[in-house]
């Protein structure tokens, strides 16, 4: 018998319909479901594929460096970071003739180019890169790492180099190595790079391999370290009139605690950043010696978990049985990893703009907007994935006997209470927030804006005040000049921090009012509803009141008629699918809020946000409509400009988004009938009927069509907003 795709499933390979192709693609990466898979081979396949993933990442970052070195303007950008526009790469073939060529020739380039809104120029400049040669060197090194990763991936699939199952299940050793090696050593190495290369570069000193051993990063070298006078490393920091990249106003300190921002670059002090990474390295190097391996010192994770039992009362058996449950479930581990990564990605979005680490990035407004939006959307997808794999864990890996009366079992036991409380919170937030917005809308429409219900966010203002913001007049903690907290930090990091918090030229602790209060609660509604759908999907994955027997139906069973009371939208996959729409919706509100508030801040007209954000028509008219004008003008009767590509992407994004509904709002019968008609016509058309196919064409399954619809909806939604965001910001600020 000939081998047909998919080789990993003989059952599917013998399917006579086109279902074979689509199901084959859908399950290609679901190694667990493949024929003759063993637990050991499963782990080995996943391990090897990680090297492939690394190879792609290294190749991609190498490409960034290479194209900027080849076609960019890094060296001229360095001379004037605030006014030269950074070039990402050239455009080979600008369509639409001479006007397009002229529109896209910018940034001092000889021909049409794309502008970089990724922040890589600021990043490379901050870490000490200065020439195109530096960029080429980096690109080659990453290309080498990419090749090395591919070789490592192939190598770990060879019989002699395949790790055993026991190696994968050795959680203590893995944690020690990841904590010490991955986080500890890499943070220490990064501190080293900052101290030996980046900080000297910021002071006009060019350190490379040829003079690396000759240039002391600190005048007294290791002396203060060896004599215990560590405070010397913080003495004589860069002054407030330091010009970044030059010796003018530069100090000699390497590890400081200045707080706040460098006045010229509006980014964190490099010496503060180095200090931070050194502290992180210290903590993680210690943490990496915490767990017991074959040396017989440290904690056993299993013992730790078994010991975590409540002292008394009806609180169950705590963490008993959790070690084996987690250690034997790849989906549980992936769920935990994705949840952590999702949170950290969202925190990256928040901190990249509020505490910018890269020189001059805070004054590149389009880049700030792009990076915030990019990281928030990625966080959303990763976090929904965490719950998806949590649900798969319950279906494939959860063993009730192993987890009797522990925290996992008890979550399942009182899932109705969890779900109903989340539901209540979502309903409360939704009705009250919408009620306030709509009330305010009506008041504006009737010409009585003074009758709006405007609520000051006094608790949030109080928290900001506790951190040192004096605008609101709360005399508390760091905003109280005679408090112990204020006095304790006055000589250390406080002057810089307090200046940063109370200065209106940055994004740290923006002044908030009734508009912020409302949109905050709209976002809270989105977060709680998304969480409700995801949590319910995971907790009901094995069985629910309607259908107690879900286990054998798997993760993604489709609608199954009225026989069991109707099984539409009750598989764990359906919950994930519905949650992604809510996730996109929520992050839409988050990014609208962030962008509008910042546009008004950067333009110096914050009153526009404050006055228009308290009612829905304000958002529609003064944010969306007003800011889409540049976009819609990309093409006009007078020709075109450099925003035309975003205008096109805006339209194209809407098209992709709308295509999603074709898959989401239709039934299989319609498509099957259409397919049969087309196949019939094909077979009866001369010449066309010379082309035959073996698989009988059938419509997509319900689950597949939903996936295709969701993919188009998501991609179109993000493309549309990306074009709007970049065009409206760069159209105003360049």
Curated annotation (Swiss-Prot):
<feature type="transmembrane region" description="Helical; Name=V">
    <location>
        <begin position="330"/>
        <end position="353"/>
    </location>
</feature>
<keyword id="KW-0411">Iron-sulfur</keyword>
<protein>
    <recommendedName>
        <fullName>Photosystem I P700 chlorophyll a apoprotein A2</fullName>
        <ecNumber>1.97.1.12</ecNumber>
    </recommendedName>
</protein>
<feature type="transmembrane region" description="Helical; Name=I">
    <location>
        <begin position="46"/>
        <end position="69"/>
    </location>
</feature>
<keyword id="KW-0793">Thylakoid</keyword>
<keyword id="KW-0150">Chloroplast</keyword>
<dbReference type="GO" id="GO:0009055">
    <property type="term" value="F:electron transfer activity"/>
</dbReference>
<dbReference type="InterPro" id="IPR036408">
    <property type="entry name" value="PSI_PsaA/B_sf"/>
</dbReference>
<keyword id="KW-0157">Chromophore</keyword>
<dbReference type="GO" id="GO:0009522">
    <property type="term" value="C:photosystem I"/>
</dbReference>
<keyword id="KW-0602">Photosynthesis</keyword>
<feature type="transmembrane region" description="Helical; Name=II">
    <location>
        <begin position="135"/>
        <end position="158"/>
    </location>
</feature>
<feature type="transmembrane region" description="Helical; Name=VI">
    <location>
        <begin position="369"/>
        <end position="395"/>
    </location>
</feature>
<feature type="transmembrane region" description="Helical; Name=IV">
    <location>
        <begin position="273"/>
        <end position="291"/>
    </location>
</feature>
<dbReference type="Pfam" id="PF00223">
    <property type="entry name" value="PsaA_PsaB"/>
</dbReference>
<dbReference type="InterPro" id="IPR006244">
    <property type="entry name" value="PSI_PsaB"/>
</dbReference>
<feature type="binding site">
    <location>
        <position position="670"/>
    </location>
    <ligand>
        <name>chlorophyll a B3</name>
    </ligand>
</feature>
<keyword id="KW-0408">Iron</keyword>
<keyword id="KW-0812">Transmembrane</keyword>
<dbReference type="GO" id="GO:0016491">
    <property type="term" value="F:oxidoreductase activity"/>
</dbReference>
<dbReference type="GO" id="GO:0015979">
    <property type="term" value="P:photosynthesis"/>
</dbReference>
<comment type="similarity">
    <text>Belongs to the PsaA/PsaB family.</text>
</comment>
<feature type="transmembrane region" description="Helical; Name=VIII">
    <location>
        <begin position="517"/>
        <end position="535"/>
    </location>
</feature>
<dbReference type="InterPro" id="IPR020586">
    <property type="entry name" value="PSI_PsaA/B_CS"/>
</dbReference>
<keyword id="KW-0004">4Fe-4S</keyword>
<feature type="transmembrane region" description="Helical; Name=III">
    <location>
        <begin position="175"/>
        <end position="199"/>
    </location>
</feature>
<feature type="transmembrane region" description="Helical; Name=X">
    <location>
        <begin position="643"/>
        <end position="665"/>
    </location>
</feature>
<keyword id="KW-0472">Membrane</keyword>
<dbReference type="GO" id="GO:0016168">
    <property type="term" value="F:chlorophyll binding"/>
</dbReference>
<feature type="binding site" description="axial binding residue">
    <location>
        <position position="654"/>
    </location>
    <ligand>
        <name>chlorophyll a B1</name>
    </ligand>
</feature>
<comment type="function">
    <text>PsaA and PsaB bind P700, the primary electron donor of photosystem I (PSI), as well as the electron acceptors A0, A1 and FX. PSI is a plastocyanin-ferredoxin oxidoreductase, converting photonic excitation into a charge separation, which transfers an electron from the donor P700 chlorophyll pair to the spectroscopically characterized acceptors A0, A1, FX, FA and FB in turn. Oxidized P700 is reduced on the lumenal side of the thylakoid membrane by plastocyanin.</text>
</comment>
<feature type="transmembrane region" description="Helical; Name=XI">
    <location>
        <begin position="707"/>
        <end position="727"/>
    </location>
</feature>
<keyword id="KW-0148">Chlorophyll</keyword>
<feature type="binding site" description="axial binding residue">
    <location>
        <position position="662"/>
    </location>
    <ligand>
        <name>chlorophyll a B3</name>
    </ligand>
</feature>
<feature type="binding site">
    <location>
        <position position="671"/>
    </location>
    <ligand>
        <name>phylloquinone</name>
    </ligand>
</feature>
<dbReference type="GO" id="GO:0051539">
    <property type="term" value="F:4 iron, 4 sulfur cluster binding"/>
</dbReference>
<dbReference type="GO" id="GO:0000287">
    <property type="term" value="F:magnesium ion binding"/>
</dbReference>
<keyword id="KW-0249">Electron transport</keyword>
<keyword id="KW-0934">Plastid</keyword>
<comment type="subunit">
    <text>The PsaA/B heterodimer binds the P700 chlorophyll special pair and subsequent electron acceptors. PSI consists of a core antenna complex that captures photons, and an electron transfer chain that converts photonic excitation into a charge separation. The eukaryotic PSI reaction center is composed of at least 11 subunits.</text>
</comment>
<keyword id="KW-0460">Magnesium</keyword>
<feature type="binding site">
    <location>
        <position position="559"/>
    </location>
    <ligand>
        <name>[4Fe-4S] cluster</name>
    </ligand>
</feature>
């Amino acid at each position: 018998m000939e081998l047909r795709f998919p080789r990993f499933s003989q059952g599917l390979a013998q399917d006579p319909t086109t279902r074979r192709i689509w199901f084959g693609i859908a399950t290609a990466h679901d190694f667990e479901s493949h024929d003759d898979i063993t637990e050991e081979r499963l782990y080995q396949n996943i391990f090897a594929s990680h090297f492939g993933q690394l190879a792609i990442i290294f190749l991609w970052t190498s490409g960034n460096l290479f194209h900027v070195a080849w076609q960019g303007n890094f060296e001229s950008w360095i001379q004037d970071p605030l006014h030269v526009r950074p070039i990402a790469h050239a455009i080979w073939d600008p369509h639409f003739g001479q006007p397009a060529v002229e529109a896209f020739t910018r940034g001092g380039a000889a021909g049409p180019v794309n502008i970089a809104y990724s922040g890589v120029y600021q990043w490379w400049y901050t870490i000490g890169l200065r020439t195109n040669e530096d960029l080429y060197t980096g690109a080659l090194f990453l290309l080498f790492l990419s090749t090395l990763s591919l070789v490592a991936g192939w190598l770990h699939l060879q019989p002699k180099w395949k790790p055993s199952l026991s190696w994968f299940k050795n959680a203590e050793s893995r944690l020690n190595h990841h904590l010490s090696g991955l986080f500890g050593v890499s943070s220490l190495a990064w501190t080293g790079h900052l101290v030996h290369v980046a900080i000297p570069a910021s002071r006009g000193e060019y350190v490379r391999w040829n003079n690396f051993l000759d240039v002391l990063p600190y005048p007294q070298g290791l002396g203060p370290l060896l004599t215990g006078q560590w405070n010397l490393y913080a003495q004589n920091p860069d002054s407030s009139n330091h010009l970044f990249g030059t010796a003018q106003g530069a100090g000699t300190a390497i590890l400081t605690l200045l707080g706040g921002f460098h006045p010229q670059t509006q980014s964190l002090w490099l010496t503060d950043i180095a200090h931070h990474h050194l502290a992180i390295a210290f903590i993680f190097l210690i943490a990496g010696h915490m767990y017991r391996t074959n040396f017989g010192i440290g904690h056993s994770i299993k013992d730790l978990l078994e010991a975590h039992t409540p002292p008394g009362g009806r609180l169950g058996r705590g963490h008993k049985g959790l070690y084996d449950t987690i250690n034997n479930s790849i989906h549980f581990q992936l769920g935990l990893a994705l949840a952590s990564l999702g949170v950290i990605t969202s925190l990256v979005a928040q901190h990249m703009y509020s505490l910018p680490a890269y020189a001059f990035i805070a004054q590149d407004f389009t880049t700030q907007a792009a990076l915030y939006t990019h990281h928030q959307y990625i966080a959303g997808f990763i976090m929904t994935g965490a719950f998806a794999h949590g649900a798969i864990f319950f279906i494939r890996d959860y063993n009730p006997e192993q987890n009797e009366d522990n925290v996992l079992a008890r979550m399942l036991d009182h899932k109705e209470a969890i779900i109903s409380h989340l539901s209540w919170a979502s309903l409360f937030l939704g009705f009250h927030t919408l009620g306030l917005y709509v009330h305010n809308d009506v008041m504006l429409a009737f010409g009585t804006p003074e009758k709006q219900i405007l609520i000051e966010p006094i608790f949030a203002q109080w928290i900001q005040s506790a951190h040192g913001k004096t605008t609101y007049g709360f005399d508390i903690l760091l905003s109280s000049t005679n408090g112990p907290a204020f006095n304790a930090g006055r000589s250390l990091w406080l002057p810089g921090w307090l200046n940063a918090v109370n200065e209106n030229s940055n994004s740290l602790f923006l002044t908030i009012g009734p508009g912020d209060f409302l949109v905050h609660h709209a976002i809270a509604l989105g977060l709680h509803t998304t969480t409700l759908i995801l949590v319910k999907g995971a907790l009901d994955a094995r069985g629910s009141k309607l259908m107690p027997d879900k286990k054998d139906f798997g993760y993604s069973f489709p609608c199954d008629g009225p026989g069991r009371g109707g099984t539409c939208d009750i598989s764990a996959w359906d919950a994930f699918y519905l949650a992604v729409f809510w996730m996109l919706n929520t992050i839409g509100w988050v990014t609208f809020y962030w962008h509008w508030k910042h546009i008004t801040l950067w333009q110096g007209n914050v009153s526009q946000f404050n006055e228009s954000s308290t009612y829905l028509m304000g958002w529609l008219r003064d944010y969306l409509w007003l800011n889409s004008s540049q976009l819609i003008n990309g093409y006009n009767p007078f020709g075109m400009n450099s925003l035309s590509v975003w205008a096109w992407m805006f339209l194209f994004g809407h098209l992709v988004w709308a295509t999603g509904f074709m898959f989401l709002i239709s039934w299989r019968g319609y498509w099957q009938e259409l397919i049969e008609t087309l196949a019939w016509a094909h077979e009866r058309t001369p010449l066309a009927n010379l082309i035959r196919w073996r698989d009988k064409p059938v419509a997509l399954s319900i689950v597949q069509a939903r996936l295709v619809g969701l993919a188009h909806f998501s991609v179109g939604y993000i493309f549309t907003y990306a074009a709007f965001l970049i065009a409206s910001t760069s159209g105003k600020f360049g």
